[in-house]
Amino acid sequence: MKIGIDCRIYGPKHTGIGRYVQNLVENLLIQDKENEYVLFINKDSENDFENLKLKIKNSFQISNCKFQIVFTDVSHYSLQEQLLLPKLIKKQKVDLMHFPHFNAPVFYGGKYVVTIHDLIKHLSKGPSTTTRCTALYWLKYLGYKIVFKQAVKRAEKIITPSQYVKDELIKLYKVGADKVIVTYEGVDNKFQANTKYKILNTKYKIKNPFLLYVGSVYPHKNIERLIEAVKLIDKKLVIVCARNVFRDRLNNFIAQNSAEDLVTFTGYVSNDELARLYQEAEAFVFPTLSEGFGLPGLEAMSLGCPVICSDISVLKEVYKNAAVYFNPLDSKDVAEKIKLVISDKEILEKLKKQGLELVKEYSWQKMAQETLKIYKEAA
């Protein structure tokens, strides 16, 4: 079988979905010696794929894999994506296509599988959730709803990263339960801290002790409540955020709350640097209002970093008893739970132990195996 994968979002610079695609591709190439893969990528991911080629060259495990790379230069959420991408895919004569994000082209007529990571745009919407003018926002939102609905309707199979997303999808779109399959994401067992802390101290002006948040600062991430919480207990917060969207709005909020001395933004960091930050942090704090899975919390646990997070359904499903939960709408409760964890060595050690045990349940290898099974069923 000839399987196409849309890899235009690939690697850690594209946050959670980029990590998902990278780990899916690498593990499929390790495990699958029967099928041929066509990877559609954009030029800005070329270096990431050079690293993949190097891994293949140096690894006996994936030396016999069959794949080819097709450069597209088609932007996400663009008119080109709807009109040009289907032609590029058709030219490769794939038997099955995997779109690892909701944006499957409406005009693509072949068989495909789609991954729906979350329903955040359904739940967090309106002018307050955008930096664009209101008219343009609603136009793009209409386009999003059309593309999303078509993807859900026409896909042979739908992959979700959690039972929570599956249940919400079925509720909103009346999809048959057998069409939607949960494949939990994983934690990279090569995710290790090789960077010396002194380098981070010099580069980002970070001083111990500090709390850590990793992810975007979109409105649904609820960072304002976290900033209010650290202000209440006078704790330093490091925010690792690769994208600048909503940074200006958040900077204004920080200034209004006189929290400039407490909050440090690092921008994009390498995997090594991120691993070191997880290891050095007193705790990883995740105040999000909506998620599809919650990968950063598992990354934190894998490196012995205690997790304190929102008491929302999906995080309870994924993190189970390995986290301390708070009401994300109440900054006082956020502050109290942070203080409770970091001031009690017994709780800290218990969370570290439970976190390290929990991450053993989540494997990229297992996720790839389950995805390959879905491909076979869909074709």
Language-model regions: role of each:
Residues 1-379:
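Carbohydrate transferase catalytic cores enriched for Leloir-type hexosyltransferases
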